[in-house]
């Protein structure tokens, strides 16, 4: 895993490239290694990002979603859910910053599954009925772990594929990567704006 240190508008930042997933067979310690390294480096504000499937029918490829709640489908329950993760001023401030800077940012509920398979049609319908707006295979354990260690943390999803029961084809990993690249400008502008105003 690569760690990149730099600045954004004279503010020091650390970027972690890549992460470890539970579905790859990694332990808790390995999955939390980026957060632990951030703690070691003295980071107090953490932005955790991911690529996610869009469950909400209004979502489009390359949309960005601020995570304001979650559904934990990982069956691990490492930590007790902490609703305080999603009820602090920084979330409201980020939404305002995005609006003021004309950066399109949705808000929604992220469902975390163990993976690594993409969802079946029945699962898509179930997720929608449960109130999920997006689904992925990471992030929530890291958010809860960071919060447990008193770090201000927010999660942002990039919608890289749309989950529709009418889809005839399967989701290809290359399509997910391509969608992530198409969101680059909007995503980087959002991160830059958040850091500059933090």
PLM feature spans:
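Metabolite-binding pocket within alpha/beta catalytic cores that recognizes anionic/polar moieties
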Residues: 1-83
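Non-catalytic positions within long, well-ordered alpha-helices that form the structural scaffold/packing
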Residues: 39-42, 128, 147
């Amino acid at each position: 895993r690569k760690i990149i240190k730099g600045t954004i508008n004279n503010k020091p930042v650390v970027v972690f490239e890549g992460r470890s997933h539970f579905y790859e067979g990694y332990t808790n310690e390995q999955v939390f290694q980026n957060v632990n390294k951030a703690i070691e480096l003295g980071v107090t504000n953490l932005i955790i990002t991911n690529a996610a499937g869009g469950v909400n029918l209004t979502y489009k490829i390359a949309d960005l979603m601020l995570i304001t709640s979650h559904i934990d489908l990982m069956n691990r329950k490492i930590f007790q859910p902490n609703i305080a993760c999603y009820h602090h001023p920084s979330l409201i401030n980020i939404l305002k910053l995005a609006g003021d800077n004309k950066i399109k940012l949705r808000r929604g509920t992220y469902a975390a599954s163990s993976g690594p398979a993409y969802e079946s049609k029945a699962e898509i319908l179930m997720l929608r009925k449960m109130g999920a707006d997006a689904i992925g295979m990471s992030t929530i354990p890291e958010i809860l772990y960071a919060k447990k260690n008193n770090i201000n943390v927010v999660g942002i999803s990039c919608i890289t594929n749309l989950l529709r029961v009418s889809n005839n084809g399967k989701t290809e990993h290359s399509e997910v990567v391509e969608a992530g690249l198409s969101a680059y400008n909007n995503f980087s502008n959002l991160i830059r704006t958040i850091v500059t105003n933090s």
